[in-house]
């Protein structure tokens, strides 16, 4: 008889860590680059244009012996019904038999994965002497991106937090983000950088060695001329 593991959001939050997420993302990238993993075409459907939709993202990893999918549903009217606007659910299957293996709340997995993906990119692409990070975006993903970046780049000393669309909210958002970052890093050395609200997006961009973004922007908000260029 097939055993199906079912984990809700609280259980996943208690089990998953930043180091685990970083290792998983690195392994996924490595397997994809060598043909051992693949992403399949995304399915997108609008129930009501601009008001309700879903997307299905799927793929496989031979190294884990699994294939799976994540179904994300967005119903914009849900908050008025005291329901979340977003629902995310992941299903995993045995790649050899097709047997279902896990039913997971995809919310926290997405948070950790997104943070790890940004940080892994910075780990391999940033200069070794990078000391300053700009986090452009102050939503739910920001603490995970910052925490993962600090884990992957222990030389970082300063983190600027900016809300590109509402700069006046940056300070309050930063104050809320700091304890979340500290909690995420508590089990892996703690937070070693000063996290402060950006004086302005432009100023912080000019001073930063690494920039991570997580916003719903539909138009560019960072110009190339703002990016810091090392004198070396």
Walk through the language-model features, giving the residues of each.
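NAD(P)-binding Rossmann-fold cofactor-contacting core
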Residues: 154-184
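N-terminal ligand-binding/catalytic initiation module
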Residues: 1-111, 117-119, 126-129
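Conserved small/polar residues in nucleotide/adenosyl-binding loops
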Residues: 228-232
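Short acidic low-complexity segments
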Residues: 191-207, 224
